[in-house]
Each structure stands twice: as C-alpha cells, then as structure tokens.
Amino acid sequence: MYIVMITPECAPIAKVGGLGDVVQGLSNELSIRGNTVELILPKYDCMRYERIWGLEKTHNNLWVPYHDQWIPCDVYFGFAEGLKCFFIEPHNGFFQRGTYYGQPDDPQRFAFFCKAALEFMLRSNKYPEIIHCHDWQTGLVPVLLFEQYKYLGMTHPRVCYTLHNMRHQGVTGGHILQQVGLDPAAYMTPERLLDHTYPHGVNLMKGGIVFSNFITTVSPRYLDEIRYTDQGYGLQHTLHEHSQKLGGILNGVDYKVWNPDIDPYIAARYNLKTLDKKYENKTALRHRLWLRDEYKPIVGVISRLDPQKGVELIRHALFYCLANGCQFVLLGASASNSINADFWYLKQYLNDDPDCHLEIGYDEDLAHQIYAGADMLIVPSIYEPCGLTQMIAMKYGTVPIVRHVGGLADTVFDANYAHKPYHERNGFVFHDFNHEGIEAALHRAIGLWYEYPQYFRELMENGMRYDFSWNHPGQHYLNIYHHIQEI
C-alpha cells in the first residue's frame, strides 16, 4: 500500500511533543510491513538537519496558489531514521521563524502548507491510496482534497485523520478559506468548518473531522473523553455527528530507541531475566546527579512542565517524596517563563539537598538514565490523550504512578485493581486532581517499596511483560486503511 503522511512533526528531526514520536514510530512500522511510506513536512529552519541523511533539492519550480497569488516553493528530499521525507520550503519565509509553532499567523502558515502538500503531490504525480493527516495543522488537507484536488485528478486517495490533542484546534478568521481558494459562505456553516465558540471563526480541526474518511484518537479512553466530556473543547457534537467513522488506537513505543536491553545510554543493559542489573543504573544515576547512596526509592519525572501535565501536583509530589523517605529526580522544561522560573527557584532552593536533583531542560541521555535508574515515575496529568512516558517506564521496570485519564487509564492498572488478575497490574492510579489524590498513590507505592519489596518487584516485572510496541497499533491502522479504501 502507498501511504503519504502529511504532518507538522516527525521525531527526531522536527519534534515538539508526542505527535512527532507517533508519526515516526507508525511510519516505521508500516514500512517494516512492506508498505511504501512517504512523509511531507514543512522545511523548518530549526529542524535537526544533522539527523537528515542525503538532503537535496528535488523541485525548485513548485508554484502554489495562495491568497490571490502564486507562491514559489522549493522541495527537498532526504531520509530521517530511514524514512523517505519531502520538505516544502516556501519563498515567503513561512517556516523560517526559528520555531515550529507559536507564531501569530500559525493558521495561515499551516493552511498554506496543506495547500502546498497537495499541490506537490499533484504536480509530481503522487497518487497514494492513503493520506494520513495529523492534528489541526493538517485539518485542511481533506477539505482541499475532496473539494478541489479531486476535480484535478486526485480521485483515489482516502484520508485518515488523527487527533493528538483536542486542546489546540486551529481556530482563525474566515478569510483563511478565501486564501486557499474556498468560498467562506459555503464552508462557514455549523455542519462544516464554522467554529462552535466564535460566530465568525473557522475551525481547522473541525474541517479535518468533517471531511476525512476516518478519524482516530491516540487512545480508546481519550476518544470517550472527547465525545462525552469537556475534553472535546466544544467539538463533542461534531464528533457525535461523525461517530460512525471514529476509532481510538493506543500509540506505540519505539523499542529500537526505548529498550533497556539495547540502550546505549545506560550504565548496564538489562531485561526481564536480568532485572537485578537495573540497580547498577540506579547507582550510576545517583553518581551522575550527585545524590547520596542510601536505601531509598528514586521517584522520577520526565515531562514538559506544562499545566496539562499537572505541574501543581509535580511540585507537591516533590516535597511529599522528600519528606517520606524518597529521592526525587526531575527532567523537564516549560514554554511558560513563569513556570520555568518557579522550577528554577525550586532548583536553587533544593540545591544542597542530597536527595533531589532538578534538571530544567531536556537531555536525551539523562532521560534514558532516569528511566533505567528510577524506581517509580509520576505522570499526574490533568488530561493525557495517550502518554508515552508511562509505557516507556514500564519497559524499563520503573513503576508508573498516574492519574486515571486518557491513555494513562488504558495502560496503567492499579496494584489493588480487583478487576485485573495480579499479573496484569502494573502501577498505582489515583483519580482526583488534588494533593490528597497523589499523596494517597505515593503513600501506597512508597509503602510497598519499603515493606513488601517482593510485591513491588512483581509490579516491575508485570510492567516489563506488557507489549506496547507499534506491532498492534500498526495492524489496527492497516485495517482502517483497507476499510476506507472500500468507501
């Protein structure tokens, strides 16, 4: 099958969050299964070009109709982690901003990218069976495909559209439709792209939902949450109207990258049969971070310091752990200056504490070493479409402590959860987003570590037995692709 991913991100070359990991992991899995997979991305000036092999310009005469003019573009080709990638570089500087997102004209930038991606496919005679789009940034692709490019000969492709985070929907003014050649009066209706909140607004994510052949979310639980709770951020009715083409598929983890048995970044490699070597990594982590060697559990956090990720509870857990016989390690940073400043203050305040280390930023080596050396990992999110950290932690025998939301609820089952056999229980879960909730979960986890280490080890082993690879999600997506081909 010939599949084209149109995406704003792909790890490791252009990654802001989990979306980039998903695109890379799923594309690799589909390629391994014998499919032809190509990716189309913007050519950001801030990409990690050192991770792109064989980058060369392949087209320098792609003219894209946009806003009553023709914008010239160059197209480059290269390999990223073995994946075939095309990068579109418009001459108007849309993607020469030193950042991926966060610009006032982001809707215009990515509306243009949607148009340019389809124009490139048309002009280069690419007719895939499946176009797979991701989040609001590519929401206009199915709209333009079925309302414009179908009549130019692109009648074959079917579109799968994945919702990674409903919090960001690409809401903008109606003028954007005119800029890409669509009549605002025809598309700014409640059944099409009209936003639910702003009476004169266009919702790009809604366009993707309405016009795609199938929509997926990144976990089954998140699908329920966005349909039936305020996590749909106003699109609940639209999702209900299109419920016949909705499905939730749990993301996978790339075990070529996140696997303690082959991990080049950790002090001692190990697997389920050699789990005792994990403690060598605990010692190495302490030495790297200048933590004292004591008989204490290490509680880790690897996270964006974003309100969604539960920074308030992370901060509270830090002091609770230090007061209750634990060491605490954090790796993370925030796009918010105030949150960063808060954690920098905490870092300075706790600088002389031999049981605590806060690393403000992101360090790939250290992330691997925390997964390998920590005993527990906290993920106290307000909402979590899927979450990868808890699944990675389990592969490393690190017991997750999570809030019961989204993909966390689909992957972590409490040590006391009576509806699961004991060998399927793999962590600690709390429900209420408050201090009492996370304290109760930490109290149980810390108590088990100290008082019943043999039972704690069973949780570690249970987690390591779970298969969160891309094998099952890859097959689910192929089933969807085959299904929508018949439409």
Swiss-Prot record:
Keyword Nucleotide-binding: no
UniProt pathway annotation: Glycan biosynthesis; glycogen biosynthesis
E.C. numbers: 2.4.1.21
Residues that coordinate or bind ADP-alpha-D-glucose: K15
Catalytic activity, as annotated: [(1->4)-alpha-D-glucosyl](n) + ADP-alpha-D-glucose = [(1->4)-alpha-D-glucosyl](n+1) + ADP + H(+)
Gene Ontology molecular function terms on file: alpha-1,4-glucan glucosyltransferase (ADP-glucose donor) activity; alpha-1,4-glucan glucosyltransferase (UDP-glucose donor) activity
Keyword line: Glycogen biosynthesis, Glycosyltransferase, Transferase
Pfam families xref list: Glyco_transf_5, Glycos_transf_1
Membrane-traversing stretches: none
GO biological process, one term: glycogen biosynthetic process
Superkingdom in the source lineage: Bacteria
Signal peptide stretch: none
HAMAP family the UniProt entry points to: Glycogen_synth
Role, per record: Synthesizes alpha-1,4-glucan chains using ADP-glucose.
Family indicated by similarity: Belongs to the glycosyltransferase 1 family. Bacterial/plant glycogen synthase subfamily.
Name assigned to this protein: Glycogen synthase 1
Source organism of the structure: Nitrosococcus oceani (strain ATCC 19707 / BCRC 17464 / JCM 30415 / NCIMB 11848 / C-107)
Gene transcribed to yield this protein: glgA1
